[in-house]
A protein has these predicted regions:
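N-terminal helix-turn-helix DNA-binding core of bacterial DNA-binding proteins
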Residues: 6-46, 66, 70-79
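Core alpha-helical elements of the protein kinase catalytic domain
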Residues: 13, 25, 52-54, 94
Length: 100
């Protein structure tokens, strides 16, 4: 199968950070307020905003504002898209890139 590998780079780069991976792990339990996420880290609110922007820009996470609070959750469509891609490129197959 032919892939546009560049399409996967933003999401994979977003996940290539220890703090952002922990945030994704936390969000696997469900939607969380930014204030709850912040309680789990030794970082400032602007630093959390930086990480959340990267996760949201890559569409791994979605955010919604409720009053003055931001709530975040995993994007299930992007999650499945990444799972499918990683499963495909790591599986043994006849049309493997190395045989083309």
């Amino acid at each position: 199968m032919e892939y546009s590998y560049a399409a996967y780079v933003p999401a994979l780069k977003a996940l290539a950070d220890e703090t952002r991976l922990k945030i994704v792990d936390m969000l696997s339990c469900g939607e969380l307020c930014a204030c709850k996420i912040l309680e789990s880290f030794q970082i400032t609110q602007p630093t959390l905003s930086y990480h959340m922007k990267i996760l949201c820009d890559s569409e791994v996470v979605t955010g919604r504002r409720e009053g003055s609070w931001m709530y975040y959750r995993l994007n299930p469509d992007k999650r499945q898209w990444l799972f499918d891609f990683l499963a495909e490129i790591t599986s043994t197959k006849e049309n493997c890139i190395c045989f083309n």
